[in-house]
Amino acid sequence: MELVIAKHAGFCFGVEKAINTAFKEIKNNQKNNSIYTLGPLIHNNQVVSSLESHGVYTKDSISEIDDGSVIIRSHGVSKATYGLAEEKNLNIIDATCPFVKKIQNIVEEYFNKGYKIAIIGNPEHPEVIGINGWCNNEAYTVQQITDVDLIPKLDKVCIVVQTTMPIVQYEELSTLISTKSNQVEQFNTICHATKERQESAKLVSQEVDAMIVIGGYHSSNTQKLVAICKEEKPLDTYHIETVVDLDLEALQNYNRIGITAGASTPIWIVDEVVKSLRNL
């Protein structure tokens, strides 16, 4: 069996920054103050469990935190959430991905200039929810073509996109949204790491008999990788979270297997999968 590992796979810059920020806070916490993350730091259960073993616990809202430090997750949060944390005198540690922070700044700037905001992305994803919180939660969120029909004619509109959206989906939807106004400011805010991982996964999936995509089942960027691989290998793409999820009986029937991993997947999880397959 030959294994082909995607050139771009695993931790992205934003995720690595968030994890390093969290463990730095753990190391510097000499007074054993309470440390929390607002929502899962990243969409990876193994990393979240590791943080909990070091005394960093996940809370869903500021109302659940009375003291100590709160780490803002890589997906970012609304402007109002910062205000609530400040009101409670919490120590705010901002681990927002820099690329997400850039979107928040764009949205706030153009909203204050009188633009309506259109966010291309999943309205239920924490990144999109957080971004919407920088324009008073008044954005039009567009995930599919039918969502564009709900947007009225606008004087001026600013278009941004969730960092993990497929480029093809962004291009199609942004073109349609642009027809809603004569004054359009458009920003392709897809993270370059997302684009690299998607392109790399597509290339590998064209060269192998089966694809394994490693990443959290709730990870948006991992789900996008699965969808891309299934375009090439609809019946031979396997989404797993860890090595224990491998269907070794099915996989031993393939000659060439491709491997990629979501941006929230630690390298040690990838290594465990590779080792297990090489022992077949």
Curated annotation (Swiss-Prot):
UniProt-recorded name of the protein: 4-hydroxy-3-methylbut-2-enyl diphosphate reductase
GO biological process: dimethylallyl diphosphate biosynthetic process; isopentenyl diphosphate biosynthetic process, methylerythritol 4-phosphate pathway; terpenoid biosynthetic process
Xref: CDD domains: lytB_ispH
Family, as annotated: Belongs to the IspH family.
Pathway the protein contributes to: Isoprenoid biosynthesis; dimethylallyl diphosphate biosynthesis; dimethylallyl diphosphate from (2E)-4-hydroxy-3-methylbutenyl diphosphate: step 1/1; Isoprenoid biosynthesis; isopentenyl diphosphate biosynthesis via DXP pathway; isopentenyl diphosphate from 1-deoxy-D-xylulose 5-phosphate: step 6/6
Cofactor: record remark: Binds 1 [4Fe-4S] cluster per subunit.
Functional description taken from the UniProt entry: Catalyzes the conversion of 1-hydroxy-2-methyl-2-(E)-butenyl 4-diphosphate (HMBPP) into a mixture of isopentenyl diphosphate (IPP) and dimethylallyl diphosphate (DMAPP). Acts in the terminal step of the DOXP/MEP pathway for isoprenoid precursor biosynthesis.
Listed EC numbers: 1.17.7.4
